[in-house]
Amino acid sequence: MFKTIKCNQINDKLINQKIEINAWVKKIRHHGKVTFINLRDRYDEAQVLVNDEKLLKITSQIKMEYCIKVQGKLELRPSNLVNKEMRTGAFEILAENINIISRCNELPFMIEDNNNANENAKLEYRYLDLRREEQKQKIILRSKVTHTIRNYLTKKDFLELETPTFVKSTPEGARDFLVPSRIHKGHFYALPQSPQIYKQLTMIAGLDKYFQIARCYRDEDSRGDRQPEFTQLDIEMSFIKKENIFKLMENLIFTIFKNTLNISLPKKFKRMTYKHAMNTYGSDKPDTRYELLIQDMGKYFKQSSFNVFKDILQNKGTIKALIIKNQAHNFSRSKINNLEEHAKIYKTSGLYFAKIENNEFVGGIAKFLNKIKQTLFQTYSLKNNDIIFFIADSWETACKAMGQIRIKIANELNLTNKNTFEFLWIYDFPLFEYDEDTKNYKAAHHMFSLPQQKYIDTLESNPSKVLGEVYDLVLNGMELGSGSIRVHTRELQQRIFNIVGFKDTIAEERFGFFLKALEYGAPIHGGIAIGIDRLLMIMTHSSSIKDVILFPKNSFAASPLDKAPSKVPNEQLRELNLTIEDYKN
C-alpha cells in the first residue's frame, strides 16, 4: 500500500516507507542503466531514482513537464550525493511504478526563473508560466494576503458583503465598460469602476462595518501597467473620523506583512499634508526611502540679477531647488541635457543648474548667483562637488517637475533601498481642481468626499481653496489607496455636484437614487480602498502588476491566452439590438 503525499511532506519519518507522488517532471537525466527524475508540485521538489529495466523503458518516453505518478520507496541518498540546494535533497524515491498521467507538447519557453521569454508568450501560456517557482510564489502570497485580510476584518466585526457588478453607468473619470441588456432593449449596464456608491448605501442601511475584496473595471487607454480589471480592498465604516481609518489600516497592514513576509513594520505610519508633500518632495505620493528634499529658494532670488527668475517671482511663481551633495562629478553635460529634456515633459520653462568647485559656483547659471553666494553657502552648508538644480515656474508646475527630476536622479544614483517598505499618509488634499480645458472645476479625488468644516459655508466662493476630509496611503512612492469621510446630506452633495458642473437635472438623472437615499437618515461615514494588485507588486518587488494577477491582460487590454476581446456572431448582436459600424469610418 502506497501513501499518497506531496513533495513537501517528505521527511525522515517516511524513510523505507512506500509513497506515491503525483507531480510534474522538472528535469530528467538518463545515465545508462539509471535515470533521475526531478519532480515538482505546488509545494516542493523531489528526486526519483529509476533503475528497473521495465521502468527505464517508460522513462525513455518521458519529457520535461509531463505529469506523472510515481510509486516507490523513500530512501536516503549517499552522503556525497546530497543536494543541499533542495529541501528534500537528502532523500530520493526508488521507483517501483511509474504512470504517465498526461504528456506535454514541446514547450514554448523553459519553465525556469529568468527565462527571457517575451511577455505575450508568457501570457498566452500563462498556465505554464505559473509553474515557475518565482511566479507561483507570488500567486500563493496573493492568497495568503487576502486570507489575512478576511480573518483580520472579520474579527473586528466587519461584514464581507458583495455589491453589484451590473450597475447604472455613472462615469467617474475613466470610461465605463458597458453591458447591453437583452431584456431591456437599448439599455445598458455598466461594470463598476468601484463600489463607491453601493458601500455608502450599505452605511445608510445601518450595516456599519463593511469590507469587500472587490473586482473593479475601467476602460482606460492602453498604458504600460494598467489592467482593465483589477482588485481592491474596499472598506467603509459609520460614525468615524479619519483617525479611525488610519488606525485600522495601520494595524491591518502590520498584520499582513507580519503574517505573510514575517516583516515587522512600524505600527504607526508617517503623516504629511498634501502641501508639505508637494513642497518638499514634488509629489502627492512621495517616495520617502531617500531624503533628497526640494528647497524653496524664491526669497533669495529676489536679490538676484537673473531676470528670468525675478520675472517669475513677480508673477507669483516660485523657485524650487534640488541640492545633490558630493555628486557633481556624476553629472556630465550630456547627463544634465537629458535631465533638461526630462523636465520639459512636465511643461516647465526650463531646468537650470550650478556646480560648486573651489568654493565657487561654476557652470549653468553660476554668474547670476554671486550676489546670493554667501547666503546659499551658509543656509544649505554647500561644499565642493555639490550641484544644485533649479526650476522656476508656477507653484504646481515647479513642484511637479522638480519632483520628477528628484525621482530620476534618485534612480540614476541608486539612492533607493529596494528592500524597505515606507508607508505614508497624505491628507489635507484640495477637494477641487480647475480644468483649463473645460474651464470648469472637477473633483480632485471624487465627488462624494466631505469638505473640511471651515469651508462648508463658503464652498462656492473659491472652490480651489477648499480642502477635503481626504487621505491617501502611499507606499514607496506609489499611491496604494485613497479614502475620505463622505458627504452624508443631500443638500451638501447637491452643492458639490453643482460645483463640478452637474446641474440639478443631470445630477438627478445620474445619481437620483443616491440623492434620495441621503434623505433617509444617512450616518457620518467614511472609508478607503486599497489596490490589492499594487500592494502585492510592491511586496514581491515585481516590475509589473501582471506578475501578481492570476490571468492578466497585456498592455493593450487584450488576453493572448483566450484571445479576448473577440468578435461575436451577428445573431448574438441581433438579440441585443446591436449592429457594428465599420470602425475604419
Swiss-Prot record:
Location(s), subcellular: Cytoplasm
Q: Which GO terms describe its biological process?
A: aspartyl-tRNA aminoacylation
Name the UniProt key words of this record, in alphabetical order.
Aminoacyl-tRNA synthetase, ATP-binding, Cytoplasm, Ligase, Nucleotide-binding, Protein biosynthesis
Its GO CC terms are: cytoplasm
- State the disulfide connectivity: none
Q: Where does L-aspartate bind?
A: 172, 218, 445, 486
Assembly, per entry: Homodimer.
- Function, as annotated: Aspartyl-tRNA synthetase with relaxed tRNA specificity since it is able to aspartylate not only its cognate tRNA(Asp) but also tRNA(Asn). Reaction proceeds in two steps: L-aspartate is first activated by ATP to form Asp-AMP and then transferred to the acceptor end of tRNA(Asp/Asn).
Q: What is this protein called?
A: Aspartate--tRNA(Asp/Asn) ligase
Q: Give the organism's phylogenetic lineage.
A: Bacteria, Pseudomonadati, Spirochaetota, Spirochaetia, Spirochaetales
Q: What would be the name of the gene that encodes this protein?
A: aspS
